[in-house]
């Protein structure tokens, strides 16, 4: 039986086409996974570099300069060092909870990125309950901290875990009330709809100007949720050695380090989305309508511009928590709880009532 060479070539080309389709299919399968992970990783590296440089400037010293140009690879060097450190376990602690605790904290913060929009419909999960889902997910992280403190079988670690739980409960409620005010003002709990509601009026339509009291309450509450100075009571070195991190070393300690900066990144992105107009340009005093409608531009250019403005606003906002860390002293535990329950909670509740009243009267 004689087979025509053209038929053999056609069969070979068809098989090569099928194999190339499979390869491209695998590539497109991993792109949606690789892109957010790489973006989050780069975001954390930028935050670490910014904090080191800003703190060096405040303290009038030279920051990192040997790990890469301008020290931009210092965070990678620190992470690599922690990766090869010995992973010690407490002899009388609960090993399972001790190992699970850091993962619970990091995963809960990573899941918060699902509802953060970086552009027009450029969001992993455009849900109608976006901000409510973020509040629910962020409340899981203190459970991981409490697990870590309890499983360490150490009085300092356990005290740090209890402080983390008490601090989270104290500031989660004002934070939720501020988010509810924004949802009422925008008539939606979707993060995309909240940004859409702000772009209609340009720069002066940002919720920063429409909700100044809520913005201040949200700012203080988010700093407390991130456990940044002056709210780092769960890991106060002078009182608790290192708090719930005392018994941790190696990669598990690195996960807590990563979670701290991830939480700061999430908070700054949500401030951008909820109060700073999201991805919109919104330049004041420029009467060009197209500049206010940057969220309607499609294609690669529009996507790039949207991501750029979102990240630019977020990183500009980061100067506030980073500068606060190196300028304000740590509060006492009673002062922290009084600030949350006796000051922020009434202010956030009053702001919610004012927002509700204004919305009812505007009907």
Swiss-Prot record:
Provide a GO CC annotation, any one: chloroplast thylakoid membrane
As recorded in UniProt, its EC number(s) are 7.1.1.-
Name the membrane topology term: Multi-pass membrane protein
What terms describe the molecular function in GO for this protein? oxidoreductase activity, acting on NAD(P)H, quinone or similar compound as acceptor; quinone binding
Tell me which family the UniProt entry assigns to this protein. Answer: Belongs to the complex I subunit 1 family.
Its biological purpose: NDH shuttles electrons from NAD(P)H:plastoquinone, via FMN and iron-sulfur (Fe-S) centers, to quinones in the photosynthetic chain and possibly in a chloroplast respiratory chain. The immediate electron acceptor for the enzyme in this species is believed to be plastoquinone. Couples the redox reaction to proton translocation, and thus conserves the redox energy in a proton gradient.
Query: What is the designated name of this protein?
Result: NAD(P)H-quinone oxidoreductase subunit 1, chloroplastic
Q: What is the lineage of its organism?
A: Eukaryota, Viridiplantae, Streptophyta, Embryophyta, Tracheophyta
What's the name of its gene? ndhA
């Amino acid at each position: 039986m004689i087979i025509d060479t053209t038929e053999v070539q056609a069969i070979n080309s068809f098989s090569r086409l099928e194999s190339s389709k499979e390869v491209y299919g695998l590539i497109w399968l991993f792109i949606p996974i690789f892109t957010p992970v790489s973006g989050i990783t780069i975001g954390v590296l930028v935050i670490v570099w910014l904090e080191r440089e800003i703190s060096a400037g405040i303290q009038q010293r030279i920051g990192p300069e040997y790990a890469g140009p301008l020290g931009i690879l210092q965070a990678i060097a620190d992470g690599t060092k922690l990766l090869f450190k010995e992973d010690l376990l407490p002899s009388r602690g609960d090993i399972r909870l001790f190992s699970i605790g850091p993962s619970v904290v990091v995963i809960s913060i990573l899941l918060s990125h699902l509802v953060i929009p970086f552009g027009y419909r450029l969001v992993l999960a455009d849900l109608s309950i976006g901000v409510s889902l973020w509040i629910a997910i962020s409340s899981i992280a203190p459970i991981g901290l409490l697990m870590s403190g309890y499983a360490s079988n150490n009085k300092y670690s356990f005290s740090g875990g209890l402080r983390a739980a008490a601090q989270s409960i104290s500031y989660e409620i004002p934070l939720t009330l501020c988010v509810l005010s924004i949802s009422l003002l925008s008539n939606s709990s979707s993060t995309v709809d909240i940004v859409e509601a702000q772009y209609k009026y340009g720069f002066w339509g940002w919720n920063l100007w429409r909700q100044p009291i809520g913005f201040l309450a949200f700012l203080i509450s988010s700093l407390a949720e991130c456990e940044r100075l002056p709210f780092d009571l769960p890991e106060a070195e002078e009182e608790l050695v290192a708090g719930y991190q005392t018994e941790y070393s190696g990669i598990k300690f690195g996960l807590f380090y990563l979670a701290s900066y991830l939480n700061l990144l999430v908070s700054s992105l949500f401030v951008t989305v909820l109060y700073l107009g999201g991805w919109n340009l919104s330049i004041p005093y420029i009467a060009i309508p197209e500049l206010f409608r940057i969220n309607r531009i499609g294609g690669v250019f529009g996507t790039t511009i949207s991501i750029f403005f979102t990240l630019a606003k977020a990183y500009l906002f980061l100067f506030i928590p980073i500068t606060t860390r190196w300028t304000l002293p740590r509060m006492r535990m009673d002062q922290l709880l009084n600030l949350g329950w006796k000051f922020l909670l009434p202010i956030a509740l009053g702001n919610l009532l004012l927002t509700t009243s204004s919305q009812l009267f505007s009907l």
